[in-house]
């Protein structure tokens, strides 16, 4: 990062994958401790293996996780460490509140069918994973003063995990977990995979907040399904919502929150590479409710400042717009009302705004 960040004030981040934000040095450390051999031994070499620097396909991007997830998954110390270090990283980026998402099943090695990352069976269940991440986040918050909460992900290709995910959301509802998410291949719709619909219905019944990856690479119909069938309160990405103007207008009217990830959207091929033609420009023009987020900073070799710089440089974002979108992020976050109020007050104070200032 050269010089001053694009927005040097407190920020809120709502869409970042914990397992897409792991320090590569940590991967090397843990591999050494666990006696896991990697094809490379230097951080720079591992970076070359794990990052996407030019627009790729979503499949190529997802393939990057297989280079390091097997090192972290199924190891108590490692899972807690990545959570703790995540909070440290976010604090350095000026984030005062972050919602990190992950699939508890992808970090477990017991009670998961099939076992991910070709692991041997062990003793860490998805339930243990949530507990370990919570510990790391709590210690991180004490050390770095940045508050982190979890969103647990269902995976589109694993509908048989989804009911377990919602049960974990319920179990840890008062302990660090604020919502449920659905991630993965958008072509796998909920009609064909009813496990997700069932889980999200249970989430609605149990007052578990809901966000859904939709309209990232998939069409606007996936966004409609997320809102109408899964009762999503926020949309992860949602760029392709613009292809259905009626839906877009309806969601604008409903003040639906869109978790925007500009750097990610270019590198996964979700949007065309030219940032000056990005859908976010339309969302900004229409004063939509959205946030700026990194998504998977390790894989994109980015920080939150990268996203702020990109929109400042190519989409004419101003300091005022940065304030507006962070206030919107805080208003749309999944914290309990009292904590949300406190977060908003922190932002109003830091931004020199009176509480009544409305955008």
From Swiss-Prot:
It comes from Danio rerio (Zebrafish). It is a peripheral membrane protein. Binds 1 zinc ion per subunit. PANTHER family: ADENOSINE DEAMINASE. Pfam families: A_deaminase. Its main location: membrane. One of its GO terms (biological process) is negative regulation of adenosine receptor signaling pathway. This is Adenosine deaminase. GO terms for molecular function: 2'-deoxyadenosine deaminase activity; adenosine deaminase activity; zinc ion binding. It is found in: Cell membrane; Cell junction; Cytoplasmic vesicle lumen; Cytoplasm. Its EC number is 3.5.4.4. One of its GO terms (cellular component) is cytosol. The active site is at residue 216. PROSITE patterns: A_DEAMINASE. Its cofactor is Zn(2+). Catalyzes the hydrolytic deamination of adenosine and 2-deoxyadenosine. Plays an important role in purine metabolism and in adenosine homeostasis. Modulates signaling by extracellular adenosine, and so contributes indirectly to cellular signaling events. May act as a positive regulator of T-cell coactivation. Substrate binds at residues 17, 19, 184, 296. The gene is ada. It catalyses: adenosine + H2O + H(+) = inosine + NH4(+); 2'-deoxyadenosine + H2O + H(+) = 2'-deoxyinosine + NH4(+).
